[in-house]
Amino acid sequence: PEQAREMCDTARKLGKVLAYDFHHRFALDTQQLREQVTNGVLGEIYVTTARALRRCGVPGWGVFTNKELQGGGPLIDIGIHMLDAAMYVLGFPAVKSVNAHSFQKIGTQKSCGQFGEWDPATYSVEDSLFGTIEFHNGGILWLETSFALNIREQSIMNVSFCGDKAGATLFPAHIYTDNNG
């Protein structure tokens, strides 16, 4: 926290903008979809799903599996990027409530995946986390994130939006309507 404050203070003193790496905000797909949402193309968005899932993708290097040093698992490593992209496209609606459940089922059992090996005996972060964010405008956002989850795909990184006029996905950006039948 102290280093983050120093970085912020330095940026202010130099008249610079300090950006924490939420790089998906600046992707062309994100910018274009945000513009369409702002222009009402999707109508009232009532369900959003942000997914950052890995089947067997526990990072086997660094401190990713150490809760004391890392602070958490897939939510703060990969899930936060899809959550930020979703919130950015939605225009950061006011949050009414948050409910989440985390699980530690796989990382403590085995130690080999697409990103190397780790020590199951010292694995202390969640394998997966699932949450619901309810907004004051009545909409909800479902968040799904995992380092290790028994799913078919090796990786799913996407955000979907369901509005009363159209739906959309973010990576790549597609809008789905019934305008032409």
Identify the role of each PLM range.
Residues 84-179:
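Contiguous beta-strand/loop segments that form the cofactor/metal-binding neighborhood of enzyme cores
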Residues 6, 81, 156:
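Short Gly/charged-rich anion-binding patches and loops
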